[in-house]
Amino acid sequence: MGSFSMGHWLIVLAIIVLLFGAKKIPELAKGVGKGIKTFKKEMEDETPVEKIEKADSETQSTKQNETTKNV
């Protein structure tokens, strides 16, 4: 019940071809590929921002410690 057989996948593929047409499928696949590539690139770009946020939080905690010492 949990997995599809080859026959099920062929039926799904036939329905997709009927809905979108044979010419549109490569364009759709290309769009999905670009979306995945962009998503992965953005995920890699997140790392420097996280490092900056971590450095900012460490700076703020240092300032709080200095303020506490001055009081």
Curated annotation (Swiss-Prot):
A Pfam family the protein falls into: TatA_B_E
Coiled-coil segments: none
Compartmental location: Cell inner membrane
Stretches the record annotates as Disordered: 41-71
Biological process, per Gene Ontology: protein transport by the Tat complex
Residues annotated as transmembrane: 1-21
Compositionally biased region (Polar residues): 58-71
Basic and acidic residues bias: start-end ranges: 41-57
InterPro entries referenced in this protein's UniProt entry, alphabetically: TatA/B/E, TatA/E
GO CC annotation: TAT protein transport complex
UniProt KW Transcription keyword: no
Keywords from the named record: Cell inner membrane, Cell membrane, Membrane, Protein transport, Translocation, Transmembrane, Transmembrane helix, Transport
GO molecular function: protein transmembrane transporter activity
Family, as annotated: Belongs to the TatA/E family.
Subunit composition and interactions: The Tat system comprises two distinct complexes: a TatABC complex, containing multiple copies of TatA, TatB and TatC subunits, and a separate TatA complex, containing only TatA subunits. Substrates initially bind to the TatABC complex, which probably triggers association of the separate TatA complex to form the active translocon.
Name under which the protein is recorded: Sec-independent protein translocase protein TatA
Organism: Campylobacter fetus subsp. fetus (strain 82-40)
